[in-house]
Amino acid sequence: DLDYTTAITLILVGIVGGMVIAAIGSGGAFVPTPAMITLGAPGIVAVASHICHKFPKALVGAIKRNKYGQVDVKLGLVLGVFAEAGVLFGKHVMTDIKNSFGAVGTDLYVSAMFVVTLAIVGGFVFKDYRKLKALDDAGNGEEQAAPLTKLARWVQSVKIPGTMIYSKGAQAELSVLFLVPIGFATGFLASAIAVGGFIGVPAMIYILGLPAIMASATELVIAFIMGLGGTIFYGLEGVVDIRLAMLILLGSLFGVQLGAIGTTYVKDYQVKFTMAVIML
């Protein structure tokens, strides 16, 4: 049941989630999704409702950060197309679990995937933050450009005719063949446990070679596309609670404005530190 206390709690949760999605591009799923489960919503309803509220705030955040020149629109659109395929596959996995094991099964699935994903990605990002912080300190307070990983240099060096697109964020041509698995994995996690940005953002940084600021902003474009498709897919299953989605959206639209403004005052390594701390 939805009372006044629960409604206010969801709005506050939305504010925090909105700040996170604008700041680090992760969608902040680890905030509203567990909160909805804690308040009694089944795992599949929590994930579906989060996806429903995600695409409007992602659009707002993308437009806001594009004004600051932080969004690689072309890359975001291409990754978003492949992510939509992952969304559809993830939805089928979730509904199969629901049909086989009920609400308890979806709760366990969401919780287990959260723990594994956040631990692995968070640890990797925190390690990279320490390297960037050391470079920044060595530069006497002036922000140093993040060095490309060996993998990113290799990906940017591969030229496959007929598959290349120019990425403003990476300032290099990238093969679409490398974007397929990144987009699909991002979409799968977004649809299964609503945390696609935890794969998409680090992948754009460490595999494609985008700066953290641009990767987190570009993820908002992907989140919009995934959220729109996911809402339709889950809506057809009848598991979207529009009340939960709208209350969280109400708070997140305010929070996303604060988060977007905040990114103009932080350094690249500070974005990665925030990502790592929140994940872990």
Question: What are these regions, as identified by a protein language model?
Answer:
Residues K57-Y68, I225-D241:
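Membrane-interface helix-cap regions at the ends of transmembrane helices
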Residues A58-G61, L118-V121, V125, A223-G230, ...:
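Helical transmembrane-bundle signal
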Residues T6, P42-F55, S216-L220, G238-S252:
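Structural signature of hydrophobic alpha-helical transmembrane segments
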Residues D1-V13, K67-A185, L236-L280:
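Juxtamembrane transmembrane-helix boundary motif
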Residues G25, P42, D72, K98, ...:
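A helix-boundary/kink motif common to multi-pass secondary transporters
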Residues T9-G17, I21, G25, A29, ...:
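Alpha-helical transmembrane segments in multi-pass membrane proteins
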Residues A46-V47, G76, F198, A215, ...:
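Alpha-helical transmembrane segments and their helix-entry boundary regions
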